[in-house]
C-alpha cells in the first residue's frame, strides 16, 4: 500500500464524487474526473 498511497487516495476521492455527487458541492473547483491532476 505504501508506494501506491497517492494513487489509492486519488481513486478513493474519484469514487466518492461518483457515488455521492452531492459531496462535490463542497469542492466545486475540483476536476473530479478519473486521473485528473487535482485528485492525485
Curated annotation (Swiss-Prot):
Any one Gene Ontology molecular-function term assigned to this protein's record: heme binding
Positions of the Globin domain: 1-40
UniProt-listed Pfam families: Globin (PF00042)
Disulfide bond entries: none
InterPro entries for this protein: Globin (IPR000971), Globin-like_sf (IPR009050), Globin/Proto (IPR012292)
Entry keyword set: Heme, Iron, Metal-binding, Oxygen transport, Transport
Tissue specificity note: Red blood cells.
Role played: Involved in oxygen transport from the lung to the various peripheral tissues.
Assembly with partners or alone: Heterotetramer of two alpha chains and two beta chains.
Family per record: Belongs to the globin family.
Protein name in the entry: Hemoglobin subunit alpha-2
Organism of derivation: Saara hardwickii
